[in-house]
Amino acid sequence: RDYESPEIRTKRIQQGVESWKELSEYGSTIGLKYLLWEPMSVPREVGETIQSAQRIQDFCKQGFTIPMKLCLDVDHGDVSSCNPEDTDPHTWIRHFKNDIQVIHLKQSLQDKGGHYPFTKEYNLRGKIVPQEILNSIKEANIKSCSLILEISHRERYPFESRVLADLKESVEYWRPYFTCGC
């Protein structure tokens, strides 16, 4: 319910950021170089639009001992937003180029319904193209970030029998983009 009230939502976000600030103080004492937070897809989970995520990131630039960086998920962003950029991973990459430390990769469909693998079936319908993501990273002049496959399967059949094959196919789909120096 708190996210439905702008005043209470802001207060809760600020409380969360204050907790992160305390974690940054501890993190600096144990040698961490940064902390991560991940913008999500719905208001209840925060950071669902570029504007909302930027607001939180701005709060995180105030008094942190170590920086708060972003874990950007190519499939996040609020599909109910009136701004089409809020579901465009390339816009997010360009906008947060100075804050991205990690990018979660998964195939993204219009329904935003899962952590889809990079298999022929999903790639035909999906919007995540490796070279386009890498081009956006390069154009944003991001010097270093970790790209992580974040693929999961429903714990149901027939998906259960496909897990390893889908993971292998996903790795093979991305492999040429990392072995060629692109």
Describe each PLM feature range.
Residues 1-69, 166:
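Active-site acidic/histidine proton-transfer and metal-coordination neighborhood
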Residues 21-25, 50-182:
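Histidine-acidic metal/acid-base catalytic patches
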